[in-house]
Each structure stands twice: as structure tokens, then as C-alpha cells.
Amino acid sequence: MTLNLCVLTPNRILWDSEVKEIILPTNSGQIGVLPNHASIVTTIDIGVLRIRHFNDQWFTIALMGGFTRIRNNEITILATAAEKGSDIDPQEAQQTLQIAEDSLRKAEDKRQRIEAKLAIKRASTRVKAINPIS
């Protein structure tokens, strides 16, 4: 039994193939999805989508929020933005994280702190997506 996974962004189809399992970051925590999972519609948090392929190799996608629908072994993820871990430049991702952390230290009001924390969450998600599960 397999799962059909489709990850869509406003600009493109990022992933469209059969997989064994996924670990999905939702607003209420991570959920693991295997074949014959209960049908749900849920929001996606900023976080790393982990995908287990048939050869037991793991792949990652940095998700920047969105929605997902799981029904009849079909998983459709509508992401605000997404990037494959293998496409992320490690040096650039680390630099972006450092800039976001500096922005938090320099934040002068509540709005700047909230924006900086969100930037840190996005940047750290990209850094985490670089290294898939072994």
C-alpha cells in the first residue's frame, strides 16, 4: 500500500509521486502519515516535511505554512512557499538565520520582535531541511 503525495506552491508542483510515509508539521504538532490514514484537513505550520521513499531514503521539504488534505491515501499539500532540502544552499541558509537572529537582538518594539521571531523560524526550518533523516 502506498501514499500519493503532491506538494503544490503558488508557482509550481514541487513533489508528485508515491511514497511510503510522511511526517508533516501541523499547527498542532507533527503527525506521521502512513497508508490508510484517517481523512483530515489541517493547517501546516512552518516546518520540515519529511518524506520516506520506497528505498527507505528520506527527503525533506521546508514548508512555510499552508493547508493539507489527506483522503484515500492521497495527500495534497498546498504550501504558501516550499523548497526541497536538496535545493537549499547551506551557507546562504545559515547566513539568513544569522541575520534573523541579529534582527531579534536589535528589535526595539513588539512588532519588530514578532517579525524577527518569524524570520528565525523560517530560516531555521530551511537549515533543518538541508540534512534529511539518515
From Swiss-Prot:
Domain of life (superkingdom): Eukaryota
Localization (cell): Plastid, Chloroplast thylakoid membrane
Gene3D superfamilies in the cross-refs: 6.10.140.480, F0F1 ATP synthase delta/epsilon subunit, N-terminal
UniProt xrefs under InterPro entries: ATP_synth_F1_dsu/esu, ATP_synth_F1_dsu/esu_N, ATP_synth_F1_esu_C, ATPsynth_dsu/esu_N
Disulfide bonds: none
Record CDD domains: F1-ATPase_delta
TM spans (from-to): none
Keyword Membrane (UniProt): yes
GO CC term (a single one): chloroplast thylakoid membrane
Membrane topology summary: Peripheral membrane protein
Keyword terms of this UniProt record: ATP synthesis, CF(1), Chloroplast, Hydrogen ion transport, Ion transport, Membrane, Plastid, Thylakoid, Transport
Pfam families: ATP-synt_DE, ATP-synt_DE_N
GO molecular function annotation: ATP binding; proton-transporting ATP synthase activity, rotational mechanism
Family: Belongs to the ATPase epsilon chain family.
HAMAP family associated with the record: ATP_synth_epsil_bac
Quaternary data: F-type ATPases have 2 components, CF(1) - the catalytic core - and CF(0) - the membrane proton channel. CF(1) has five subunits: alpha(3), beta(3), gamma(1), delta(1), epsilon(1). CF(0) has three main subunits: a, b and c.
Record function comment: Produces ATP from ADP in the presence of a proton gradient across the membrane.
Record protein name field: ATP synthase epsilon chain, chloroplastic
Provenance organism: Pelargonium hortorum (Common geranium)
Lineage: Eukaryota, Viridiplantae, Streptophyta, Embryophyta, Tracheophyta
